[in-house]
Amino acid sequence: MKTLLRTLLYLALIVWLGAEIFFPVVAAVTFTTLQPQTHIAGTIVGQLLRILHGMGLVSGMVALALLALGPAWGLYKPRSVLAPMALVIFMMAATVYSQFGIIPAMERDRMAAGGAIDTSDPTNPNTIDFNRLHNRSEHVELTILLMGLATVVLVARAESGKS
């Protein structure tokens, strides 16, 4: 039973981190393939990012539940799961911020700039703000990935509870 629960925890983290690692590859391929139609590529990537965030939040809830219950089930010592739990909470908070803060603001800026950022005036305040938010979004996703990798390391070295 302990092996199954640990496996589920690692699976939740793998799904989230795998998606975080794979997303930039998909985005790059999408923009390369649809180069003349960057608006369509951006729409596709935006939808994929929403899916990534949904997967991340579900994976985060599963990981958080397993980490919280791990000491009671004898998987880990109570103190050894505190840091991984905090990181998962921060990862989920960053995901929520990106999904419900950054993405809607980028969409508003895109629409206010005329619907297609690549054809809008680069000095337009909406275009400037869109690009600023896009840069922030990239940093948030990188932060989520790095916190996820740290979580994996901390979970891997977490002390086991009594058998």
Describe the role of every protein-language-model region.
Residues 2-82, 107-131:
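Interfacial loop at the N-terminal end of multi-pass membrane proteins
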Residues 14-17, 87-103:
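Hydrophobic alpha-helical membrane-insertion segments
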Residues 25-26, 97, 101, 150:
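Transmembrane alpha-helix boundary/anchor motif
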Residues 35, 69, 98-101, 154-157:
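Helix-loop junctions at the membrane-solvent interface of multi-pass transporters
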Residues 61-64, 141-160:
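Selective detector of the "anchor" transmembrane alpha-helix that sits immediately C-terminal
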Residues 70-89, 155-163:
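Cytoplasmic juxtamembrane regions at transmembrane-helix boundaries
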Residues 132-140:
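Individual transmembrane alpha-helix segments
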